[in-house]
């Protein structure tokens, strides 16, 4: 492989707990040093690397001698608080072997939801990269509550890729990639080597497999891949135990499942809407509204809303769905759930008389919307 001819200039590598522990209950330092070697080789070849690492809770369990704790949020936070220091120490020591420094960024959903904090996180990330320091990103599980759930770091790595305008996102797991059926139950399952479009049939293939120590499954990796590719970022899902896997992926060799980036990626603000904010509610749209939004690029009007799901304030990101629950778009609502329930199915010129005020004709303006 010729690192001097690499087309990528900035790469995000996500390592799952199953990769870091090699299926055991503790961090596999021998394997971690091999992964650090590959990332260091990229840095020295002029490719900037961002590492999104899981493993804090597993490291905490190991450091405390595998205590028998109830499976509660508080205990997960305890383990994460203890383990995060051990995890960053391990990575710092391993990268120092190759003369590289690391910097730690612990993020929560709130850091990505607020536009100003989102931009500040981006500036911190870029400052580290511009000074030849490897940013190491993890979910701030010690203070987060809702974030300790399936898929946090898969989605976090995609958001990190958007933050730093990466060219490639590598999601390393204990599977070779995405298969046409579950390879653990079907020995004839075939690896899908190339994905151009992510649709419902592909999401069904991803299933919901979850490793014993981690929190991510193939379904969440598919979600992360979809976020990244919409921003013009290529994605590879591959086995973290394959020899030279990071270098192979960056050199575009035949490894894992490769997801092609969209030719016309979303502009920066819409990337933030899609990746920076968690949807807090849903609007069910009629057929006409779905066509107007998805095919004609129009704003969503109250007339096209059939029903409101959830409680939320104005300025909240919502999922726009059809009658079968399929999401067709995501956008920022100009009205609260309480207001929307009063104007559902009504014409825009009736809003002020019904509410006593209005925030514009559109419930979700097209500039605040991402069509999926």
Swiss-Prot record:
PROSITE patterns in the cross-refs: GLUTAMATE_5_KINASE, PUA
Organism domain of life: Bacteria
Subcellular location: Cytoplasm
Binding site for substrate: 54, 141, 153
Pathway this chain belongs to: Amino-acid biosynthesis; L-proline biosynthesis; L-glutamate 5-semialdehyde from L-glutamate: step 1/2
Function: Catalyzes the transfer of a phosphate group to glutamate to form L-glutamate 5-phosphate.
Keyword RNA-binding: no
Family: Belongs to the glutamate 5-kinase family.
Alphabetical list of SMART domains matching this protein: PUA
Documented EC number(s): 2.7.2.11
PUA domain segment(s): 280-358
CC per GO annotation: cytosol
Main location: cytoplasm
Catalysed reactions listed for this entry: L-glutamate + ATP = L-glutamyl 5-phosphate + ADP
Stated name of the protein: Glutamate 5-kinase
